[in-house]
């Protein structure tokens, strides 16, 4: 039976990325950000590596100062094939980070919701480097990566003037299986059925929840932990890496809640807390099968 292996490594993330991956590897970068690598393929999802929001909202009600330092700088990143953004919010579409990546890697392409055209414009990317994403329009990026954007509801749907979704998730079809990164979303009518139709083995879901006082300030929320777990159980998803916490003091949860909930799954679901300093390895051949119990190693 295939495994989702968790390896706790010593030293910096940059140092550990010097070795070529043998399987599909995921590294959490904070908030909703992940680096995904496999042999011959490397891409980012929603990487927030700057501190731009602290300055943008310095005079605001809620401080956006980072609670965690970026685990890696753009200068330290290995070569990247693709950068994915799920929506226009600055901790998901981080223009300073995108601009630096584009300057460092001339061949990297950026997959961005078509409805985020105005937000990405300030990054100064050449048009041939951008792939516009729209819900349910499959994107064949390479022989080892096919991506399907899926509608997301960040406490509700939003559309641009052309009717295109402002919020997206992505289904990543890689050699080891199917990974679902939901973007910022809640469960909405039809989402479960859509995900069951594709059958991902691994879900990357936000668990920071939502609160009326934040909604009133135009800060929409997401799944809470219980909802994310139930969604995976209902969708027969084998493993959940819970994320979107620990970045901003006003909009997070206690990560110990994830640790407390994990043993209660009784082998129905691998509930895994996002952590820095961990390599999550998705062993090739996992597609179509349940994962065995997660293993953790020290390196």
Give residue ranges: language-model regions:
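Metallo-beta-lactamase
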Residues: 2-21, 112-177, 261-284, 292
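Pre-active-site segment of Zn-dependent metallo-hydrolases
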Residues: 11-18, 41-85, 96-100, 157, ...
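Divalent metal-coordination and catalytic microenvironments
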Residues: 36, 46, 87, 94, ...
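Structural motif
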Residues: 41-43, 81-82, 109, 177-179, ...
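Cap/insert and terminal regions of metallo-dependent hydrolase folds
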Residues: 66, 109-111, 115, 186-276
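Active-site environment of divalent metal-dependent phosphoester hydrolases
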Residues: 52, 89-93, 117-119, 137-140, ...
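Catalytic core of the metallo-beta-lactamase
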Residues: 22, 29-37, 140-201, 219, ...
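Active-site HxH/HxHxD metal-binding segment of metal-dependent hydrolases
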Residues: 52-58, 65, 71-139
């Amino acid at each position: 039976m295939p495994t989702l292996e968790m390896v706790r490594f010593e030293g910096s993330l940059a140092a550990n990325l010097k070795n070529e991956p043998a399987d599909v590897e995921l590294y959490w970068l904070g908030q909703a950000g992940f680096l995904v690598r496999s042999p011959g393929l490397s891409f980012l999802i929603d990487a927030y590596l700057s501190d731009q929001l602290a300055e943008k909202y310095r005079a605001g009600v809620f401080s956006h100062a980072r609670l965690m330092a970026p685990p890696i700088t753009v200068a330290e990143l290995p070569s990247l094939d693709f950068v994915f953004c799920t929506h226009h919010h600055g901790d998901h579409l981080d223009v300073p980070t995108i601009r630096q990546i584009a300057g460092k890697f001339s061949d990297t392409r950026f997959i961005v919701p078509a409805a985020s055209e105005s937000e990405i414009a300030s990054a100064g990317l050449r048009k041939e480097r951008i792939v516009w994403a729209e819900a349910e329009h499959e994107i064949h990026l390479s022989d080892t990566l096919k991506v399907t954007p899926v509608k997301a509801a960040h406490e509700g749907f939003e559309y641009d003037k052309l009717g295109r979704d402002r919020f997206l998730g992505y289904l990543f079809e890689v050699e080891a299986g199917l990974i679902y990164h939901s973007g910022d979303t809640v469960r909405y009518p039809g989402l479960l059925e859509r995900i069951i139709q594709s059958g991902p083995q691994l879900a990357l879901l936000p668990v920071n929840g939502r609160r009326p006082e934040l909604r009133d300030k135009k800060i929409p929320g997401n799944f809470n932990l219980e909802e994310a777990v139930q969604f995976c159980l209902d969708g027969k998803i084998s493993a959940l890496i819970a994320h979107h916490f620990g970045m901003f003091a006003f909009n997070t949860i206690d990560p110990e809640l994830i640790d407390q909930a994990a043993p209660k799954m009784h082998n129905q679901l691998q509930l895994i807390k996002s952590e820095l300093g961990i390599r999550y390895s998705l062993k090739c051949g996992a597609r179509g099968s349940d994962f065995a119990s997660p293993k953790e190693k020290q390196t």
